[in-house]
Amino acid sequence: MIGGVDVSGLSFVTVHQVPGNILQGDWRAVWFISEEASDDQFDAIHDAFAGRLGGPLADLADLFGEVMDVKRAPITHATVQGKGRLLIGDVVSGEMEPYRSPDGQTITTLRDSLFSTVPGSPAYVAKASHNRVDLPDYDLVWSFEGRNAIQSDWTIEHRAEAVA
């Protein structure tokens, strides 16, 4: 729920370019919201990630120097123990497979590390078979194969508490 609007089952993805140190901000981005979102759901998700509702997402929003567009798109993503896939229409495609121990049984993770992308959650160390972005109208175009990748499970939840 965002401001009384149920956004269950919907996705938000940002495709962005970071010009230097990630914490210095000035990111250039195009944001994508699930194409099946109603207008109210779209607006609620946009408002949250634009920082208009405060909280940790407002801190994140401060890092974006320019959001060039916010678009509806078909978004498909799945992550299972470090193996991940992301598709956004025909403009973004990426897949990654986690590194494993020599016997192949244990997935390589980083915990409580500077390289963990989400504190308290394991970072899955992986190799991306491919990562392609084709957004020429925004000068966001690249295609990589066989590069390193890290991902984490991430959930944010806010529960309003009654003030006595």
Segments the model singles out, each with a brief description of its role:
Residues 1-3:
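N-terminal ordered "arm"
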Residues 31-32, 81-92:
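Short, hydrophobic/proline-enriched secondary-structure or compact coil segments at domain edges
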Residues 55-81:
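Short glycine-rich, low-complexity/disordered patches
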Residues 98-164:
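Extended, charged low-complexity segments
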